[in-house]
Amino acid sequence: MKDAVAAYGRFFETIAPDSLDRLDGIVAPDVRFVDPFNDVTGIEGYRAVFRHMFETVDQPRFTILRTAIDGDTAFYRWRFSFRRKGVADIWTIEGMSEVRFLANGLVAAHIDHWDAASQLYERLPVIGTLLRWIRRKLAV
């Protein structure tokens, strides 16, 4: 299990468009992937999520900050940095992935947990202003 967890973490830290073909040996054919934008089942849907990432952002990079294992599940604390197309600023998102492994070491499910509102939407023009206002109104 530890080897599979480490290998999956390395895959993300070195992810590139040409590495997506390696997913066949890393994730199960019916893998489920969930994040704030996607809920897909199957290896092709999983690949499509990352193809879309490479099409829409420049210099995407995942850094695994911490890993914990509980039974067949690993938890990865990570930082994702990228540049929006045509924008010089580097954006950073931090989150946690809950990843369930099968007995053969393949990934069965990958569920991402991160706050899209505060880490992404609030940084966008117009909608960001509205969301920051709402957050201030709801805060204690």
PLM-predicted stretches and their roles:
Residues 3, 7, 45, 91:
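Soluble or luminal CAZymes and related metallo-dependent hydrolases
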Residues 55-61, 65-140:
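A beta-strand edge to alpha-helix "cap/lid" segment located at domain peripheries
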Residues 2-26:
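Short acidic-aromatic low-complexity motifs
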Residues 20-72:
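A solvent-exposed, acidic/Ser-Thr-rich amphipathic alpha-helical stretch
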Residues 1-10, 33-36, 52-57, 108:
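Short, mixed-charge, low-aromatic patches
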